């Protein structure tokens, strides 16, 4: 069995730790290589003098040492939390912005998932990790990302997963794989929610739904039709609120999904900020 390779970004905040603990818990029986990644940037001071250059270098070295030190501490914490001998942990301290640091690592290390919190050290959701998580979802569009809400505690296995879709394209095996990994591993129920008007589906939507049926032969799934509430995001949140068994929401991100055309609503962005349960975004290679 090929080990799963997973990036866990951290800014050493409680929220970052919460996402790490979540990842270690859901993959507790799966052999994994975890890349614990901290990125940092030293802003140029704008003075093009030798002194400024020397200051930047000094600052850079200080920040780098701090990052290495904090990562070492984080690894010790992880190893006391996670005793699985089939889990390997690799610390990466990278002098770059978060999106680049993650993107390059995904590419070089053939990463399967990026799992990160939705709130960073600042505590304001839209600041740091908040907007960063969305940036990672948007820019690192060649790797599935799981955004873990800041106060989310996993209490049990994953019972049910909600895939929200507009049946806007024919599903390919590669895009369903990151979702089916969880469904199969946890023997979870898969709810496939079509959110929109309850009018009859267009022919291409029917084809998409039929294709999905063929791909899901061996698993426990059910289709549901949901009338769109004020927004797709609200509708999804209400479904999760109502059905307490849903432990993960999944969406496939196309450049402009059916949802976004239909509603002019940046659904993925909204759900990534508002979801009460972990949110898996899978990208479509167009």
Which residues make up each language-model segment?
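Gly/Ser-rich helix-loop-strand patches that form or flank binding pockets
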Residues: 103-152, 240-286
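Small/aliphatic-rich secondary-structure junction motif
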Residues: 1-57, 160-226, 246, 274
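N-terminal, Lys/Arg-enriched amphipathic/low-complexity engagement segments
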Residues: 72-76
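A short acidic, glycine-rich active-site loop
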Residues: 55-69
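A short helix-to-beta-strand connector/capping loop
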Residues: 80-90, 217-224
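Conserved N-terminal glycine/acidic-rich loop preference
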Residues: 67, 111-114, 154-166
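Charged docking surfaces used in two-component/phosphorelay signaling
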Residues: 90-101, 231-233
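A short, acidic, amphipathic alpha-helical segment used as a generic capping/interface helix at domain edges
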Residues: 229-242
């Amino acid at each position: 069995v090929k080990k799963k390779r997973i990036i866990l970004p951290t800014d050493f905040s409680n929220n970052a730790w919460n996402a790490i603990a979540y990842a270690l818990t859901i993959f507790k029986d799966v052999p994994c290589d975890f890349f614990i990644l901290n990125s940092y940037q030293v802003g140029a001071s704008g003075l093009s003098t030798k002194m400024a250059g020397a200051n930047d270098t000094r600052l850079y070295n200080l920040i780098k040492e701090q990052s290495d030190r904090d990562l070492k501490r984080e690894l010790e914490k992880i190893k006391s939390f996670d005793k699985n001998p089939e889990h390997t942990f690799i610390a990466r301290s990278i002098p770059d912005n978060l999106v680049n640091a993650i993107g390059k690592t995904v590419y070089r290390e053939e990463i399967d998932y990026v799992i990160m919190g939705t709130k960073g050290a600042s505590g304001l959701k839209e600041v740091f990790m908040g907007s960063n998580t969305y940036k990672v979802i948007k820019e690192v569009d060649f790797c599935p990302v799981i955004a873990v809400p800041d106060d989310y505690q996993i209490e049990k296995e994953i019972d049910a997963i909600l895939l929200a879709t507009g049946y806007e394209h024919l599903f390919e095996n590669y895009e369903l794989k990151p979702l089916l990994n969880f469904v199969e591993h946890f023997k979870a129920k898969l709810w496939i929610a079509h959110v929109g008007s309850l009018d009859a589906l267009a022919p291409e939507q029917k084809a998409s739904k039929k294709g999905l049926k063929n791909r899901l032969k061996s698993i426990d799934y059910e289709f549901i039709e949901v009338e769109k509430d004020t927004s797709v995001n609200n509708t999804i949140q209400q479904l999760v609120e109502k059905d307490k068994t849903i432990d993960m929401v999944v969406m496939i991100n196309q450049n402009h999904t059916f949802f976004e055309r239909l509603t002019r609503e940046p659904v993925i962005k909204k759900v990534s900020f508002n979801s009460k349960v972990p949110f898996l975004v899978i990208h479509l290679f167009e």
